[in-house]
From Swiss-Prot:
Mg(2+). Can also accept Mn(2+). It comes from Desulfovibrio desulfuricans (strain ATCC 27774 / DSM 6949 / MB). Keywords: ATP-binding, Cytoplasm, Kinase, Magnesium, Metal-binding, Nucleotide-binding, Transferase. CDD domains: ASKHA_NBD_AcK_PK. The keyword Magnesium applies. It comes from the Bacteria. Substrate binds at R95. This is Acetate kinase.
């Protein structure tokens, strides 16, 4: 069974075609600059294998339809194609940012589901309209092929009410559904399953803490295989310090800055989402640049690193106690989590008092695949597990189609 996974943005579209019998990625790619004078399509055949072949094409893509038509042409190309006809695709899985409280599982797309995506655009104004566009383009170009929506907020629907409610007037929840939703849910769900598999433990018994650390970062507390708490909130702004996002701050800062700087709500939103975090502290968003500046003696870069690590450790500690100290694994994933040994070492520094011990050599070694970086006598295994959101979406699509 072949599943196409689509992640549509406002001016871009990521895709991946998987053979689900083996979980092999047949091809993947990115169409970008859609709607601009010159678009670009980067297409990889057998990505991340010794047979990888890269094709780059430029063209004018007035809309996502033209971009996806070029993708289909590459998929079915007589010489370079990975399928003979688009009818070989059994289903299409779509990443959708926000489903609100209306959906708690991946769902087969119909008019009701598209209506939910539209309604939740107020909570995901940058992503939901683009995600819906991706669905409608797929319906147009792949008639008769079922589409499945996989929501980034799905995993957070498993939280108990005391975890997702804010201590605001209750009518704000009733009227506006203001609550914690959590994001990176597809990644956290995949990592929960992969962690259980790595440990040889039933998912229904798993108690773990997942650290999805990248330009956008979040953490998830997993109890009995489900989300028990998570760091992001109503929006992806809450929680950890990130590349350009401030993370959790005193809410009173917002009206204070608006008054003192004469800013509009939109300007403050931009300031907190796109001009804060590591960028606001030291002028860099890439951790490699931050580390390089720390080596040069840049005090603001050193401060940014310390604040980032501190925000992770504070959340880690709270989740440890939410799990009553009974934790099966601490798991690092995503760009920083998988590749930054300095951040991992700093996050785990001092945890020896809880019996959690890191193997410095193993932590500093780059390896592919899931692995432990803790010592054999560590009280809790510390793991690196590469995330795979596309595979999780594809597996969810297969599950929905099988119902």
């Amino acid at each position: 069974m072949k599943i196409l996974v689509i992640n549509a943005g406002s001016s871009s579209c990521k895709y991946q075609l998987l053979e689900m019998d083996t979980h092999a990625v047949l091809c993947s790619g990115l169409a970008e600059r859609i709607g601009q004078d010159e678009g670009r399509l980067t297409h990889k055949i057998a990505p991340d294998t010794d047979k990888e072949e890269k094709i780059v094409q430029t063209a004018h893509f007035p809309t996502h339809v033209q971009a996806m038509e070029m993708v289909i042409a590459l998929l079915t190309d007589a010489e370079k194609g990975v399928i003979k006809d688009k009818s070989e695709i059994a289903g299409i899985g779509h990443r959708v940012l926000h489903g609100g409280e209306a959906v708690s599982d991946p769902v087969l797309v119909d008019e009701r589901v598209k209506g939910i995506v539209r309604e939740c655009a107020v909570l995901g104004p940058l992503h939901n309209p683009a995600n819906l566009m991706g669905i409608e383009v797929a319906e147009k170009l792949f008639p008769g092929v079922p589409n499945v929506a996989v929501f980034d907020t799905e995993f957070g629907m498993g939280m108990p009410k005391e975890a997702f409610m804010y201590a605001l007037p209750y009518e704000l929840y009733e009227d506006l559904r203001i609550r914690r939703y959590g994001f990176h849910g597809t990644s956290h769900k995949y990592i929960a399953g992969a962690t259980a598999k790595y440990l040889g433990k039933p998912l229904s018994e798993l108690r773990s803490i997942t650290m999805h650390l990248g330009n956008g970062s979040s953490m998830s507390c997993v109890r009995n295989g489900k989300c028990f708490d998570t760091s992001m909130g109503l929006t992806p702004l809450e929680g950890l310090i990130m590349g350009t996002r401030c993370g959790s701050i005193d809410p009173a800062i917002v009206p204070f800055v608006m008054e003192k700087k004469g800013l509009t709500p939109e300007q403050v939103d931009t300031l907190m989402n796109k001009k804060s975090g590591l960028l606001g502290l030291c002028g860099h968003t890439d951790m490699r640049d931050v580390h390089a500046e720390v080596e040069k003696g840049n005090e603001r870069a050193a401060l940014a690193l310390k604040m980032l690590v501190r925000s992770i450790k504070k959340t880690l500690g709270s989740y440890y106690f939410l799990l009553d100290g009974k934790v099966d694994a601490l798991v690092f994933t995503a760009g920083i989590g998988e590749n930054d040994d300095i951040v991992r070492a700093e996050v785990c520094a001092g945890l020896e008092n809880l019996g959690i011990k890191i193997d410095a050599k193993e932590n500093g070694t780059r390896k592919a695949g899931a692995r432990a970086i803790s010592t054999p006598d560590s009280s809790i295994p510390v793991l690196i597990i590469p995330t795979n959101e596309e595979l999780q979406i594809a597996m969810a699509t297969v599950e929905v189609l099988g119902k």
